Amino acid sequence: MSYIEKIDPDMFEAIQKEADRQEHKLNLIASENYASRAVMEAQGSIMTNKYAEGYSGKRYYGGCDFVDIAENLAIARAKEIFGAKYVNVQPHSGSGANMAVYFSVLQPGDTIMSMDLSHGGHLSHGSPVSFSGKLYNIVPYGVSKETEALDYDELMKMAKECKPKMIVCGASAYPRVIDFKKFREIADEVGAYLLADIAHIAGLVVSGVHPSPVPYADFVTTTTHKTLRGPRGGMIISKTEELAMGVNKAVFPGIQGGPLMHVIAAKAVAFKEAMDEKFRQDQAQTVKNAKVLCACLKEKGFDIVSGGTDNHLMLVNLNNMNITGKDAEAAMSKAGIIANKNTVPFETRSPFITSGVRLGTPACTTRGMKEKEMELIADYIETAIKNAGNDALLSEVSAKVRDLCSRFPVYS
């Protein structure tokens, strides 16, 4: 940091303040986590200096001997932790990974059946404001109004009616186990490709805490941060060599030029960390923590979408609390708790306002927090949301949150 402090004091100050925020605020954003010092060291390494268009052994630049080693390590480790045969670690993001999969087997105008964003899907699965919604004919599916969970019989019926070229499963705000085998059966019934986007649950999957889509899906995409605790980036797993060849061409030269070799090096480090028993224990604890936090909030009268959680996140419908997601997010922020407003199934408000909040336990679990801390956190959330206009009380909660965080440092 001394180099930045000397060259760019303004940026140094911003980084220091962000470091303080991360250490002393309670992060409940389900898509965020803390990369290890080893991952950050790799990402900040001299690998950033190297251009390496192409793939290992077939580059368009000389001098790629050692970045080839880095990419080969990332690929081999990804294959091992996911039990996969064909892996591309070059995508810069999860959305880019999805784009490459679409481009590899679909034509503009083809039909994609995917989860509606307001029911827990993702922008890149076909939202009208995303490239995916503009290029393809999107048939959205949602959760059952009765159970607020997926109804696979209804999905089969929809697929038979719309006959999609591709079915996308996976979500950014769905708290229940996804049955990838049933999705495979639905895809086979209508002759569709199956893409499983496991960006949120990848860490749970490699640890055996959530079923894996790899045996069932034609394509599996993921980010490498979130529950995987790696650098920000994407990855694609393909079921067959033929599909993998199409994906490789779609990634480069299709949508990207040079890969980010420093990020790929960091991905390799993260995948090695994911092989460790401590990582697996943390993933199991992440789910335990989510279940406890969820149960505590239910006891306090909060309406939990689908009645609970099977993974790392939960959706809280705040309509019975007479507060919007936007206002709840702001109140929690004043109390030192960082979360995000979120639409709930059958939402009636704007996505800028929302009726709910999404809460996740990956980041606080990485800090070492367990069930006992989840009970405290539920108390803090209740106080913040039920006293949104009481700045003095929110300040008191913030002090308690800061004390809690100080007992579980991110980078000790």
Curated annotation (Swiss-Prot):
Residues bound to (6S)-5,6,7,8-tetrahydrofolate: L117, G121, H122, L123, E242, S350, P351, F352
SUPFAM superfamilies named in the record: PLP-dependent transferases (SSF53383)
PROSITE patterns to which the protein is assigned, alphabetical: SHMT
Primary subcellular site in the record, as a coarse category: cytoplasm
E.C. designation(s): 2.1.2.1
Marked site (Plays an important role in substrate specificity) residue numbers: H225
Keywords noted in UniProt: Amino-acid biosynthesis, Cytoplasm, One-carbon metabolism, Pyridoxal phosphate, Transferase
Swiss-Prot/TrEMBL GO biological process terms: glycine biosynthetic process from serine; tetrahydrofolate interconversion; tetrahydrofolate metabolic process
N6-(pyridoxal phosphate)lysine carried by residues: K226
Keyword Amino-acid biosynthesis in record: yes
Localization: Cytoplasm
GO molecular function annotation: glycine hydroxymethyltransferase activity; pyridoxal phosphate binding
Disulfide bonds: none
Organism domain of life: Archaea
Pathway: One-carbon metabolism; tetrahydrofolate interconversion; Amino-acid biosynthesis; glycine biosynthesis; glycine from L-serine: step 1/1
Matching CDD domains: SHMT
Keyword rRNA processing among UniProt keywords: no
Cofactor needs: pyridoxal 5'-phosphate
Catalytic reaction list: (6R)-5,10-methylene-5,6,7,8-tetrahydrofolate + glycine + H2O = (6S)-5,6,7,8-tetrahydrofolate + L-serine
GO cellular component, one term: cytoplasm
Family named by the database record: Belongs to the SHMT family.
Cross-referenced NCBIfam families: PRK00011.1
Quaternary structure and interacting proteins, as annotated: Homodimer.
Main function: Catalyzes the reversible interconversion of serine and glycine with tetrahydrofolate (THF) serving as the one-carbon carrier. Also exhibits THF-independent aldolase activity toward beta-hydroxyamino acids, producing glycine and aldehydes, via a retro-aldol mechanism.
Name of the protein described by the UniProt record: Serine hydroxymethyltransferase
